[in-house]
Amino acid sequence: DTTAIIKDNKRIGTAVIARFDFNTQKDEQILVNTAISGVSMEGAAKNLQAEVPENDFDKYLAETKANWNRQLGKIEIKSDNENDKVNFYTALYHSMIAPTIYSDVDGAYYGPDKKVHQANGWVNYSTFSLWDTYRAAHPLFTYTEPERVNDMVKSFIAFYEQNGRLPVWNFYGSETDMMIGYHAVPVIVDAYLKGIGDFDAKKALDACIATANLDNYRGIGLYKELGYIPYNVTDHYKAENW
């Protein structure tokens, strides 16, 4: 459905796009600075001013290249096989695509309760595909991105406080419920056991226990009553419950 609905002077709908036409000459290049916010147009403007204050494409291209080289340079491998290097650093790059920052430069973010919240002194993250990532990607982050792991756990705790459950598959501040298990738990435990960050361990533990005891979540009530449910689900819950 690509039909936009106008409500409160805003266009809403599925697959709605914005189109801009510029009166350019042949081979003319134009420079357009854009920014986004999960909160407001004002937030997007603040993000743009903070992150791209100058109209200098080449400067930001050079900074972006330097940032990626610094990120990928956190792990150095030695090999005479160029294909091995390409495969390794491509995989390392892929590991850095998500999670994504979901708070504005002023700390404001849109929570799962559809309210605007404030992250003071930390960065709110989203895009947690936890069934896919708790086994390898998140343990990797504890070595390559420990300061981000701290903020990720704080994001989990905030999500629990606003949603009543730790995230399962958090995407842009909302719960998609596309996966089984509640794999935020092993991510939290791994960070705690490695002594990472200053997140509130008591709040984190309370969130883990409360999530594990939600009878109405995907068979947990039967799991608690019988000690088992279909084996493929039990296999995933064991990672959280042991």
Predicted regions and their residues:
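Acidic/polar, glycine-enriched structural segments that form the non-catalytic walls/loops
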Residues: 1-124, 158, 165-168, 198, ...
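Aromatic-rich carbohydrate-recognition surfaces in CAZymes
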Residues: 126-242
